[in-house]
Amino acid sequence: MASNSWQFAGADDESDDDNFNPAPADMSDEENNDNDEETTHNHRPAGKTVRQASSPVPDEEEEEEEHDEEEDARPAKRSRRDHHDDDEDEEQDEEENEEIDEEEEEDEEEEEDEEDEDDVHGGNRRKRRNKDRRAAFFDIEAEVDDEDEGEDEVGDGEEIEDFIDNAHPDDIADSGRLNDDRRHRELDRRREMEASLDAEKQAEILRERYGKRAPARGYGDMAIVPRRLLLPSVEDPSIWAVRCKEGKEREVIFSIMRRIEERMGTKNEVPITAAFERGGINSVMKGYIYVEAQRQNDILVALDGILNVYPRSNMHLVEIKDMPDLLRVIKTPNLEPGAWVRLKKPAKHAGDLAQVIDVTENGLEARVRFIPRLDYGVRDDPVFQADGKRKRPGVPGPRPPQRLFSEAEARKRHPRYLQGNPQTNSWNYNGDDFENGFQVKDIKIQQLEVKNVNPTLEEVTKFASGAEDGTENLDLKALAATLKDSAKSVAYVPGDIIEVYEGEQQGVIGKATNVQGDIVTLQVTEGDLAGRTIDVPNKGLRKRFRIGDHVKVIGGSRFRDEVGMVVKIVDDRVTLLTDQTNTEITVFSKDLREASDIGGQGSLGQYSLLDLVQLDATTVGCIVKVDRESVVVLDQNGDTKQVQPSQITNKLPKRKFAVAADRNGSEIRLDDVVREYGGQQRQGKIIHIHRSYIFLHTTTTNENAGVFVTRANSVTTVAAKGGRNTATAGPDLSAMNPALKRNPTASGKQMPAPRTFGPDRAINQTVVIRRGGYKGLLGIVKDTTDTHARVELHSRGKIITIPKADLSFKDKVTGKTIDINQRGGSRGGFGGGGRGGGEFGSRTPMASGGSDRTPAWGSSRSTARTPAWNRDAGGSRTPAWNDGSRTVNPYDGSRTPYGGATAYGGIGSRTPAWHSGSRTPAPDSFGHGSKTPAWSAGSDSWGSKTPGYGASAPTPGASGDAWGYTPGASGGGNSSSAYDAPTPGGGLSAPTPGAALNAPTPGAYSAPTPAAVSAPTPGAWQGGWGSGGDAVSAPTPGALGAPTPGAPGYADDD
């Protein structure tokens, strides 16, 4: 049974193979390959059916028939399989489904390969069947059972033949490449042909080629919209200026842009319309960003948390009228070397003309040269004004005039700050660079005025370099380039004679009949076109004058409103002789016009040229120019002002007998010729003297009619009017000294200071400058000559040279005025031997009634004892007296140095002790034989015994009388011996070095140094014998009190 069933099954298989539609002769290789693969998967025995691939590809209809046959055969095949077991059917169905899927994918790939091969062999491209892309998602291919496919294996040789292509590459070359090369050659020939045609034919070809195309369709309204309607209105979002960190404007804008992108499409979108910045190095709007929004609160929300922006402070709303200016672009001017510009900064050079030397690559800075403003004097000092007075730092002073740099003056004034090379004429002075007299500096572009420069001829002439023959070399090209822009501002009026100097009509001369904008209508007066009317642009025009024409300066020149006659014409430069000053000036022709009026006599009403007028309570000035309706005044500060006659307070009469003192104290008057001591060292004749200012007139310059002003103490006399002697003509300035008036004896005839040897005592002394520009400043002397001293100022740290006569020496500790040439104390009276003045002001220090004061000791006229002398205040004596510390004394030890013992007036000042046993050379009053030399007290006192011996003849003086002769001696004051003043003693047995009755050395009442009443230091007792004074209360040094060495004796009377 089993065998029968097996046979039945085998018969079914064979019948299936027999009933399967045999492959047609034109069966494709794809199907053949599919059958081969099916046989390999099902492990069918080979040799049953061998299909040969045919070269022709079946048509679409044949393929569809094959699919239909396969679908018809499939139900029959499935019905036969019902006899098998269920398990076998399920396994076979799964394998069939997997194989069908693989077959479909392989079929698609093989079809594409076959089509490519057919194209190569056939040479003609076959229309490729378009497959629907949606077919990939549907099972539209016919399912083929594995059993229906052939299980024949293809031989190895046949597979190799199908795999290897024996065709030659030239046989299968793509014809499209050849066509591509042909098209390129045709395009090249067409372009060469078009290039050989002229422009008109090319334009015609382009018009035929592209002219028929319809224009691109525009969006929106194509009608013209007035510009006023494009301006923002109140309905548009507002713009706020938000403060940000300078230089970070662009970073802030990028941060806002990133925040907008991050929050786009979310519920926290940035609620602003736009944000932009106008920062930059040259921008005036740097430090701000501009945000456009409906509300200000929206900006706060949008900028919250962004760095370098400060929305909650200084947010400004931009007005509607200013909104267009935020988006207006200003072209940065392009500077070229040689161009003319004007400086904005520094303030000292504001408005000065400069010439560009070079421009940096980034265009941010330019190196320019200009004429420096240096005074080389006090006005360069930041602490002083032009008048020599002190001022606060930072306050701008008057501007010095423009002058080329002078190496000689700089070396004379500040040699320490001058460096350079004389061969190249390049210098560095006070940190500034100078080349050929011009100052060279790198300045930012925004600090330069590049538009409407309008350089005047006198300014440009200063920059001209001299040639070898002495002529001026002007850079006319650079000047013309600068004047090109300013030519548009030249005002032509009907009636002007105009010349065309450039263009097709160059050389035409005519009279202006009409001016409209930049077009001038000319009526030609000379040449071939005479009588005709032409229109020319004003950029190629210039005014024309003839020698002898009467013209007036109307331009921006400093000679504005000058009237004169033309005497010379060179190109566009005109030289005229002024009517007022009879001087020649040269200006550009564009700054002139014909003058119908004739210059007056230099007067306007009651005011004439060079008159001194009062402008206000503190300002006077000299008239330097007279116009038809106004005058120009040079005030006392050196500034020029144009004022109306009604603005002048009054006219000051000319003081013929006005007197002033120059720098040397010499007397100067009107018409004297003087020269400035510093600065420009200008020389002129005095025309006005007003207080400390003098107005001078010079013929070396025409500026301000040759008038300049300076201070009287800054000039020196060159020539006095009438040839008077200026050396002795000055007033007695010593009579003006109040100190000399108060103490006239001090100003008596005094001996000059003794000549000293060795280093000058003034060196390293502290001094105060008494007069001059540095008056009142404190300094220390570094070096001296016979007449001058070099002083280092404490406040400035600089060394200046100043005459010794202008210095006052101060004590370094107390700050008191001292005399460095005096030795010891001050000398009073004639000859220096008297008591001196009796005023308390002359005592140093002043006496008072306190007895415990040091060094003052009492209310009497004797002052300044050191230390305090009162015996009751014994504790203050140094060292204390009357104790065991006295050394050396034959009785109780020498007391050192208390009371009047040292060095005057007291017994203690005698060295050695004065006891009769130790006296040298006289032991006592009885041993006359021991006196060396001896003399008689009763002998003639006029004998000038030297030395002598007497009752009381101290050396140099004693207490005989109040005249204080030096040396003096007297016992009673009535004998002739008192005036004889022998040395060492006389009178009352005054031995040397001591005397009995307070005979100190140098003296008591004669007030030498030390002295008594005239407040020397140290001093002695108040009076002599019988005067009621305390004779024994001498301070240190003093009289009778603790002498060193000495004897106590009667020193303890009280």
Curated annotation (Swiss-Prot):
Localization per Swiss-Prot or TrEMBL: Nucleus
Key words of the record: mRNA processing, Nucleus, Transcription
Stretches with biased composition (Gly residues): 825-840
Major location category of this protein: nucleus
One Pfam family, short name: CTD
SMART domains membership: CTD, KOW, NGN
Function of the protein: The spt4-spt5 complex mediates both activation and inhibition of transcription elongation, and plays a role in pre-mRNA processing. This complex seems to be important for the stability of the RNA polymerase II elongation machinery on the chromatin template but not for the inherent ability of this machinery to translocate down the gene.
PANTHER family documented for this protein: SUPPRESSOR OF TY 5 (PTHR11125), TRANSCRIPTION ELONGATION FACTOR SPT5 (PTHR11125:SF7)
Protein name: Transcription elongation factor spt5
Organism of origin: Neurospora crassa (strain ATCC 24698 / 74-OR23-1A / CBS 708.71 / DSM 1257 / FGSC 987)
Gene this chain is encoded by: trf-3
